[in-house]
């Protein structure tokens, strides 16, 4: 497991009974988490006294209750600054477990010894884009949601990177990659967080289990002749990490060599000293030693 254990402004205080108790800066929140299936005692007072709890409804969706948190605030991760805005579907704007991947990407870029061009697909609010730019990379940030790209720009500005070489693209990721291939554009690193399920711009259905292999084949076409790394997140519980490794090995390693590794991402739980699993990340690197820079459990 790759642990995101360098946070100061975020803390997973406790988890269990399908929820997590978290500190975001000075705000205490309770949010649903399907992985927290254990029925452990709730001794921390934050379970009862907090700034907001997201409660699921019986008909789907849900809402924030007992809200005393502001509409937005910022938290820091090192020199990165992120704007937190609790949304209608439990999310806050960043996934703190991804910090392990930000650290990995920044380390790869800083040790590359050459300019690195990063393509960030399904890039959401741009935490990875901002992290890579802070390490000196030029970044192409792509997401189909205009609001998410605007939020990502805010994060870049808050981090003092409003003038960094980041291209902000609102587009369907597959269509954009197809056009980049036709243009002859190439990238040294790719980060992608494809959804489990979705619909394309003309209504076509995306299912991760069915579309992941051809999508990896597609993005391999924009890699440079000297690629540095690929990070791919998969949150689909039915997709085994070894299956994703197999895809990366047969598509990327077959073409470029290198090394592929898949592990769970995790957040340390203060109350128990254990770790909450938060999905799977697959990393391909040109060097078999590259993943050793990460913190593992």
Q: Which residues are covered by each model-predicted region?
A:
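Non-catalytic substrate-recognition/targeting regions of SAM-dependent transferases
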Residues: 6-22, 29-96, 103
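Conserved class I S-adenosyl-L-methionine
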Residues: 115-124
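Conserved SAM-binding loop of SAM-dependent methyltransferases across substrates and taxa
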Residues: 125-137
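Conserved SAM-binding motif I beta-strand of class I
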Residues: 138-143
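S-adenosyl-L-methionine
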Residues: 145-191
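Mobile active-site "lid"/loop adjacent to the S-adenosyl-L-methionine
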Residues: 146-148, 170-174, 187-218
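Helix-to-beta-strand junctions that scaffold the AdoMet/dcAdoMet cofactor pocket
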Residues: 223-225
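C-terminal catalytic and target-recognition region of SAM-dependent MTase-like enzymes
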Residues: 227-297
């Amino acid at each position: 497991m790759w642990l995101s254990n360098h946070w100061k402004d975020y803390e997973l205080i406790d988890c269990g009974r399908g929820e997590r108790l978290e500190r975001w800066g000075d705000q205490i929140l309770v949010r649903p988490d399907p992985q927290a299936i254990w029925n452990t005692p709730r001794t921390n007072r934050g379970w009862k006294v907090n700034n907001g709890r997201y409660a699921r409804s019986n008909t789907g969706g849900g809402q924030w209750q007992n809200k005393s948190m502001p509409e937005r605030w910022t938290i820091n991760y090192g020199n990165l600054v992120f704007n937190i805005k609790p949304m209608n579907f439990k999310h806050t704007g960043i996934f703190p477990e991804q910090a392990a991947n930000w650290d990995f990407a920044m380390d790869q870029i800083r040790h590359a010894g050459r300019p690195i061009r990063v393509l960030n697909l399904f890039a959401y609010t741009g935490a990875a884009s901002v992290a890579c730019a802070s390490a000196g990379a030029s970044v192409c940030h792509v997401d189909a949601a205009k609001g998410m790209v605007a939020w990502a720009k805010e994060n870049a500005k808050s981090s003092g990177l409003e003038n960094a070489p980041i291209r902000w693209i609102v587009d369907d990721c597959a269509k954009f990659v197809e056009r980049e291939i036709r243009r002859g554009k190439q990238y040294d690193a790719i980060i992608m967080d494809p959804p489990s399920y979705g619909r394309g711009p003309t209504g076509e259905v995306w299912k991760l289990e069915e579309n992941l292999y051809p999508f990896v084949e597609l993005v391999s076409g924009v890699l440079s002749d000297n690629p540095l790394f690929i990070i791919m997140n998969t949150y689909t519980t039915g997709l085994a990490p070894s299956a994703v490794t197999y895809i990366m090995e047969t598509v990327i390693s077959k073409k470029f060599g290198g090394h592929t590794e898949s592990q769970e991402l995790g957040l340390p739980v203060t109350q128990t000293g254990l770790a909450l699993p938060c999905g799977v990340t697959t990393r391909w690197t040109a060097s078999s030693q590259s993943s050793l820079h990460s913190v593992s459990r």
